[in-house]
Amino acid sequence: MRLHELRPKTNYKKSRKRKGRGMSSGLGKTAGRGHKGQNARTGGGVRPGFEGGQMPLQERLPKRGFTNAFKKEYAIVNVETLNDFEEGTEITPEVLLESKVIKGVKDGIKVLGKGEIDKKITVKAHKFSKQAKEKIEEAGGKVEVI
């Protein structure tokens, strides 16, 4: 028998630690909490990030930047994904949702130019990148901003 051939016993279940059940259990008396102090008491302990009164790390570090409340987040669709649709179809946000290309519309849909397209399709979206616009129009398709 070698180390890598060792297997645990079948149907073996390690018994849980029963704290505070007598000295001979090994976890009696203080039950692993030490002697006195805040952590020995019920409900004791300090909140996360508390460093004993010292200025906590998250307060020592400088603040940075801000969150723009007016930021628009677009659902992104690449040109290569549009290639999966049949030629001549009109691709709208509803069609993209139904076909599960996007999970949600968010603040609109933006078509980006990754990949190639060789089908003549009409795409209706809120924004297009220059490359995406060029590729769709090169393939004979139409681009409509909604």
Swiss-Prot record:
Q: Which GO terms describe its biological process?
A: translation
Q: Which PROSITE patterns match?
A: RIBOSOMAL_L15
Biased composition regions of type Basic residues, renumbered to the chain: 10-21
Q: Which SUPFAM superfamilies match?
A: Ribosomal proteins L15p and L18e
Record InterPro entries: Ribosomal_uL15, Ribosomal_uL15/eL18, Ribosomal_uL15/eL18_sf, Ribosomal_uL15_bac-type, Ribosomal_uL15_CS
Answer whether the UniProt record assigns the keyword RNA-binding to this protein: yes
The segments labelled Disordered in the record are 1-62
Q: Which GO terms describe its cellular component?
A: cytosolic large ribosomal subunit
Q: Where is the composition biased (Gly residues)?
A: 42-52
Q: Which UniProt keywords apply?
A: Ribonucleoprotein, Ribosomal protein, RNA-binding, rRNA-binding
Q: Name one GO molecular function term.
A: structural constituent of ribosome
Q: What does this protein do?
A: Binds to the 23S rRNA.
The record's note on quaternary structure and interaction partners says: Part of the 50S ribosomal subunit.
- Family, per the entry? Belongs to the universal ribosomal protein uL15 family.
Q: What is this protein called?
A: Large ribosomal subunit protein uL15
Q: By which gene is this protein encoded?
A: rplO
